[in-house]
Amino acid sequence: MNHLRLIQGGAAEPIEGGRSFSHAARQELVPANGDVPAVCMDQILRRQFSEERLQADGLRIDPRLPVISGETGLRLPTSGEVADRTLALAIVGAKGSGIPQIEVERIIDERGAYGLFTPREQDFIDEVLPSVEERDRFSWRYEAAWTLMWALRHFDAPLGRPATRCDSDRLMDTIFDIPDLARHRLRAPNDILNEADLAYRYHMAALRVGRADEATLPAIDPEVARERHHALSWLTCHDAIEWDELTGDA
């Protein structure tokens, strides 16, 4: 196998069977160099798997996109941290979708959600009459909350292609019915990284819409892709960057 070709975006042999790449997490292809981390085989295989998925969906891949983090050295947040972030996202999503301010405050009080919001989220929560644009922007946080509920094992189905909005009623009903969102352990690092790599490449494909090199985008909702990418990036990089600092533009 030509490892250099893989790193530069070439294809390896077709991946057979499942999607577990943990066995390759310690097969280092390129050693660390200063602040640049090592590249391991699981990162390469994960990228290849994602690119094959995108091509099957009729999307043109961008071979210039790098690999994402691998399992080696990965530090996921605790279930409690993910549960807190999920609850905050669901509440701002609900306010963005139009529930009354008094109902927002009741939910925060009942779930003890004080202090869970980022600075930008708190500003939105405190604004009694936010603009239509603000409401629309924060209403999409339902998608990020759904993604984290999947990571917390409350939803079994794979995330799949970011083509349609999540079932926000089911999301909120599930959250209200479960007092302890952190009652399960997080999904395995391999599974989270698989979805993170897919979300990254779907979102980058969505960002190419309207540019000279990409005129159409088959069956992808750009906003769903963005929120899913944001949530999974936070899961895999939470100890290096705050939620509000993640832009999802690259």
Language-model regions, residue ranges each:
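Extended, charge-rich alpha-helical interface modules
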Residues: 2-250
